Amino acid sequence: MHLLINIIFLINIIFIISIIFIERRNPQTTWAWILILTFLPILGFIIYILFGQNITREKNFKRKILDDKTKQKYLNSFKSHYKLDNISLKYKDLIMMNFNNDNSTYTQRNDIDLYFDANSLFQEMIYEINKAEKFIHMEFYIFKSDEIGKKILQALTKKAKEGVEVKLLVDSIGNSIHKKDIDKLKAAGGDFKIFFPGFCKYINLRINYRNHRKILIIDSKVAFLGGFNIGDEYLGKDKNIGNWRDTHTKIKGLAINDLEARFLLDWSYANESDLDIDLKKYFINPHSTNLPNNIIGAQIVSSGPDHTEQQIKNGYFKIINSAKKNLFIQTPYFVPDEPMLEALRLAALSGVDVKIMLPGNPDHKFMEWIANSYFESLLNAGVKIYLYEKGFLHAKTIVADSSICSVGTANMDIRSFSLNFESNIFIYNEAISKSMEEQFFKDLKVCTKVTLESFEKRSIISRIGESIIRLVSPLM
């Protein structure tokens, strides 16, 4: 046993050397790993094996080059359509940053609907799936074989039998679809893939990198993107959770092209095959006469460990810094890095009405402690913090100055910004932004406001937990 501990300690030293001199991570993350590998050697060793290893640089660059080249094929055809309305002109620098960092095309011919409850969303999804004529592409983090999951799987299987191309991509950790349901889909002609599978059912050394996206695209006519996964709990059927508050979008128009490109890139990666895109088959022609007439500016922005930049985080950062009047944020998990924390503080100190809404009943106690560790600094700067009490808040949204908003899969935490594969839609439109604001204020009615006075009354155990877990927050 003593020999084993010495071996683990030696390996941990090698890990530390690699983190400092080879991986060259940011100082916060580096110090967090040094602390846990040094003072908790056995636990630290296990955690590092499961959560600490970076995807190799070779894979990073290979995937990034594929991403850039593939998307550039069709992005070139959109350049002549790059026009900005008055709202979008205010955010020209954000639009250009998203384009330069992620090849995120700015489009205007879009219709966008918002969904705040799973019942109406799932009904609409099944309705659109049943109308499919050419293809259905679906990519989800969590997909369960429960009542709603089976309904959607049955709809997919039915369309596959009719000859519609059906591709279903799920995350290896989030997936819990029964094998018999997968077999039925495949037997009907559908295709099913797992993103980052482990080398056996219960062991996955790439657990640190999750495909957190929730995407559904049908015939390039309609797409869905947002925070809802597929399962009965999102319908409020889990007694331990209760009501599930989330936000999702339904998209029609040119913005679908970037979402389709993202799906195809993820699919080819999971399929371990080269990607040969048939533009006519999967993408909307920008000259089509069937495009929506609405002028709703939008960009699909994706990020992940395969990207050299943290695109969604950078987009949030620009929105926060550009806010002049108000800034409303909803996120189930709140673990900002120092630049993001300081941006929120500076916005409030500059007179911007900054409101952040978090779950009052979090699903993980340690995530509550981490979030709480940032409260005092934010409250002192004038940031208003609210805890949602009517069930669980899972929405990932940001809206500023009644003119710009973002909805998607990314939480406001280090994991979503740098480790998970995520996608958000950035919407440059007053009507959509005001709808988001209205829902935010509806949610405020069932929130508890956090004040410095009430916060200082928390228990000693909570204070100790916050202090300890804050040290490893860069790893969360």
UniProtKB/Swiss-Prot annotation:
Residues 207-234, 389-416 form the PLD phosphodiesterase domain. The chain crosses the membrane at residues 2-22, 31-51. InterPro entries: Cardiolipin_synth_Firmi, Cardiolipin_synthase, CLS_N, PLD-like_dom, PLipase_D/transphosphatidylase. GO terms for molecular function: cardiolipin synthase activity. CDD domains: PLDc_CLS_1, PLDc_CLS_2. Keywords: Cell membrane, Lipid biosynthesis, Lipid metabolism, Membrane, Phospholipid biosynthesis, Phospholipid metabolism, Repeat, Transferase, Transmembrane, Transmembrane helix. PANTHER family: CARDIOLIPIN SYNTHASE, PHOSPHOLIPASE D. This is Cardiolipin synthase. It comes from Clostridium perfringens (strain SM101 / Type A). The gene is cls.
